[in-house]
UniProtKB/Swiss-Prot annotation:
<dbReference type="InterPro" id="IPR053853">
    <property type="entry name" value="FitA-like_RHH"/>
</dbReference>
<dbReference type="GO" id="GO:0006355">
    <property type="term" value="P:regulation of DNA-templated transcription"/>
</dbReference>
<comment type="function">
    <text>Involved in plasmid stability.</text>
</comment>
<dbReference type="InterPro" id="IPR013321">
    <property type="entry name" value="Arc_rbn_hlx_hlx"/>
</dbReference>
<dbReference type="InterPro" id="IPR010985">
    <property type="entry name" value="Ribbon_hlx_hlx"/>
</dbReference>
<dbReference type="Pfam" id="PF22513">
    <property type="entry name" value="FitA-like_RHH"/>
</dbReference>
<keyword id="KW-0614">Plasmid</keyword>
<protein>
    <recommendedName>
        <fullName>Plasmid stability protein StbC</fullName>
    </recommendedName>
</protein>
Length: 97
């Protein structure tokens, strides 16, 4: 359950409640947190982040660009051009007013 989104700095963070977590699991995470010198909450955040965004993952854009290069759709020069002209600002919500 994600009850709300809190804004912190320039990004939003979610608050997550985990129900029915077995005591053995909570105890193991507490021990793991102590071994890493951080709070249980910080340990859980680290576990979730590593699970959701593992190191070495291939991002979708990079994957699609590699496919295009393999089939001759984009040269390295064209790929660089797209990378340098990409819009990085967040999209604005549509307004019908």
């Amino acid at each position: 359950m994600i009850p709300l989104m809190a804004k912190t700095g320039n990004y939003q963070v979610a608050n997550v409640n985990v129900r029915n977590l077995p005591d053995e699991v909570h105890r193991a995470i507490r021990i793991q947190a102590a071994l890493h010198g951080r709070s249980t909450e910080a340990e859980i955040r680290d576990i979730l982040e590593r699970a959701a965004r593992p190191e070495g993952r291939v991002k979708l854009g990079s994957f699609l660009a590699s496919i295009a290069r393999e089939v001759g759709g984009l040269t390295d020069k064209e790929h660089t051009l797209f990378e340098n002209t990409r819009i990085t600002s967040p999209a604005r919500a549509v307004s019908f007013e």
